């Protein structure tokens, strides 16, 4: 069977509700605007339908990102084997204590959302916790690297919102990753649209445990139109 290494099952109701190629910032903004249009029943039906569609497509294992408990009932009775990554994010969030109830579900572990949306202390705490793989959004847009250079759309967005970042001194997302995550921790790096050879060298030179590059081509084309430089991998 096939493996879907990166899924947001609980967001299945948003399929087709957000314009294509609006870029990462546009996608995030549109998501916050449209999500309240859907009832709890519509959301639940979309989760059921997505699970069934994946099984029909030959998918037998899924790495699913979760921010809440709305999809666990479907996953518990599905024929698909799910591994759930409970996602921590928020520049004003100091700990993951509010997510701990979700970790009671089977095959569920904590992961940071990305290297640009989590402050240093919680990132290091999550990276040091347990031995399950981490699933991290990585270099999805040019703005991620630009943020560490105090420029670009993420930098402007954060400045306008009054967010401060205590991690920009690392110099780049890749350098932050290897400084904060132990070398023997397995990682799934998701999207990878804007990785460079230097990023790859930094990452692969650090980790002794497996690193999986999860490319999400359909998602990348839909959100930004960007394609990972697969020739480097």
Describe these PLM feature segments:
Residues 1-12, 133-142:
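Histidine-centered catalytic micro-motifs
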Residues 11-45, 83-86, 141-185, 206-207:
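Active-site gating loops and adjacent loop-to-helix segments of metal-dependent hydrolytic enzymes
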Residues 91-99, 145, 221-228:
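Short, charged, surface-exposed secondary-structure boundary motifs
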Residues 48, 52, 60, 99-133:
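Active-site gating/metal-coordination segments in enzymes
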Residues 3, 28-29, 60-61, 81-83, ...:
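Structural preference for beta-strand elements that scaffold enzyme active sites
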Residues 7, 65-66, 84-88, 111-114, ...:
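A cross-domain feature marking catalytic cores of carbohydrate-active enzymes
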Residues 113-124, 163-233:
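Active-site-adjacent C-terminal substructures of enzyme catalytic domains
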Residues 13-77, 99-105:
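Alpha-helical scaffold segments that flank or form the walls of functional sites
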């Amino acid at each position: 069977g096939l493996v879907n290494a990166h899924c947001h099952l609980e967001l299945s109701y948003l399929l087709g509700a957000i314009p294509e190629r609006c870029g990462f910032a546009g996608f995030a903004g549109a998501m916050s605007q449209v999500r309240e249009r859907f009832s709890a029943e519509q959301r639940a039906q979309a989760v059921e339908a997505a699970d069934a569609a994946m099984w029909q497509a030959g998918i037998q294992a899924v790495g699913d990102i979760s921010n809440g408990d709305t999809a666990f009932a479907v996953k518990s009775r599905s024929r698909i084997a799910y591994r759930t990554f409970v996602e921590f994010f928020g520049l004003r969030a100091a700990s993951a204590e509010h997510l701990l109830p979700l970790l009671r579900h089977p095959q569920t572990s904590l992961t940071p959302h990305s290297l640009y949306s989590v402050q240093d202390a919680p990132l290091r705490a999550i990276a040091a916790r347990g031995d399950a793989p981490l699933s991290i959004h990585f270099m999805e847009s040019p703005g991620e690297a630009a943020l560490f250079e105090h420029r670009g759309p993420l930098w402007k967005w954060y400045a306008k919102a009054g967010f401060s970042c205590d991690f920009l001194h690392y110099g780049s997302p890749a350098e932050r990753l290897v400084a904060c995550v132990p070398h023997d921790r397995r990682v799934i790096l998701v999207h990878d649209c804007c990785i460079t050879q230097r990023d790859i060298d930094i990452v692969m030179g650090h980790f002794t445990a497996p690193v999986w590059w999860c490319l999400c081509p359909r998602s990348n084309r839909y959100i930004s139109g960007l394609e990972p430089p697969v020739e480097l991998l």
